């Protein structure tokens, strides 16, 4: 026969491989230094033998240090600063500074400078038969006061002019 090809079996006796070598045998780790003997469990080493016969360390108990009262202790006070709220002609959700509750403000419309200017302008244009009082009925021409619905405190005012 000729030389074996890539897909032909080699001629001769077949050798069954044995177990591969261990890592230490392959790399040669600790080949010059002998391994130290394992510690014997018992009272000499501080190990306690458990119910399964294996050694285990005794539990370490940690005592928490007792805090020492400091005569120079400083009391810390937290101060919350509320951002300024801009009031417009719509209800505003905010924390009431009087009752410290989260609320949505109630609105109240009052005659302001724009209402009176509108009334005066209508009088000058000739609406003297009562039509000059129409601005007092239109909320869009009046100032707006914001009140807390819980404690009824005045929280702010929106002036149109």
Curated annotation (Swiss-Prot):
Keyword Transferase: no
Annotated LITAF domain residues: 76-160
One Gene Ontology biological process: negative regulation of non-canonical NF-kappaB signal transduction
Short sequence motif PPxY motif: positions: 20-23
PTM (free text): Phosphorylated on tyrosine residues in response to EGF.
Gene induction: Up-regulated in macrophages exposed to lipopolysaccharide (LPS) (at protein level). By estrogen and lipopolysaccharides (LPS).
Tissue: Detected in brain, heart, lung, liver, spleen and bone marrow. Detected in myelinating Schwann cells in sciatic nerve and in bone marrow-derived macrophages (at protein level). Widely expressed. Highly expressed in liver.
GO molecular function terms attached to this record: DNA-binding transcription activator activity, RNA polymerase II-specific; identical protein binding; RNA polymerase II cis-regulatory region sequence-specific DNA binding; WW domain binding; zinc ion binding
Localisation per UniProt entry: Cytoplasm; Nucleus; Lysosome membrane; Early endosome membrane
Main location: cytoplasm
Keywords per UniProt: Cell membrane, Cytoplasm, DNA-binding, Endosome, Golgi apparatus, Lysosome, Membrane, Metal-binding, Nucleus, Transcription, Transcription regulation, Zinc
Reported consequences of knocking out the gene: No visible phenotype. Mice are born at the expected Mendelian rate and are fertile. Mutant mice display altered responses to nerve crush injury, with higher numbers of macrophages in injured nerves five days after nerve crush injury, but at later time points macrophage numbers in injured nerves are normal. Bone marrow-derived macrophages from mutant mice display increased migration in response to CCL3, but not in the absence of CCL3. Mutant mice show dramatically increased survival in response to a dose of lipopolysaccharide (LPS) that causes rapid death of 40% of wild-type mice.
Purpose of the protein: Plays a role in endosomal protein trafficking and in targeting proteins for lysosomal degradation. Plays a role in targeting endocytosed EGFR and ERGG3 for lysosomal degradation, and thereby helps down-regulate downstream signaling cascades. Helps recruit the ESCRT complex components TSG101, HGS and STAM to cytoplasmic membranes. Probably plays a role in regulating protein degradation via its interaction with NEDD4. May also contribute to the regulation of gene expression in the nucleus.
Assembly mode: Monomer. Interacts with NEDD4. Interacts (via PSAP motif) with TSG101, a component of the ESCRT-I complex (endosomal sorting complex required for transport I). Interacts with WWOX. Interacts with STAM, a component of the ESCRT-0 complex; the interaction is direct. Identified in a complex with STAM and HGS; within this complex, interacts directly with STAM, but not with HGS. Interacts with STAT6.
Name of the protein in its database record: Lipopolysaccharide-induced tumor necrosis factor-alpha factor homolog
Organism: Mus musculus (Mouse)
Gene assigned in the entry: Litaf
């Amino acid at each position: 026969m000729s030389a074996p090809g890539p897909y032909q079996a080699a001629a001769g006796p077949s050798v069954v491989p044995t177990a591969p070598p261990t890592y230490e045998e392959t790399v040669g780790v600790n080949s010059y230094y002998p391994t130290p003997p394992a510690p014997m469990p018992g009272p000499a080493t501080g190990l306690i033998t458990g119910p399964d016969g294996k050694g285990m360390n005794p539990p370490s108990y940690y005592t928490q240090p007792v805090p020492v009262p400091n005569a120079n202790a400083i009391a810390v006070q937290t101060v919350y600063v509320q951002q300024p709220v801009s009031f417009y002609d719509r209800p505003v959700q905010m924390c009431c500074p009087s009752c410290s509750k989260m609320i949505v403000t109630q609105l109240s419309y009052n005659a302001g400078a724009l209402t009176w200017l509108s009334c005066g302008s209508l009088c000058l244009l000739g609406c003297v038969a009562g039509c000059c009082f129409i601005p007092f009925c239109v909320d869009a021409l009046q100032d707006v006061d914001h009140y807390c619905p819980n404690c009824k405190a005045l929280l702010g005012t929106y002036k149109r002019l």
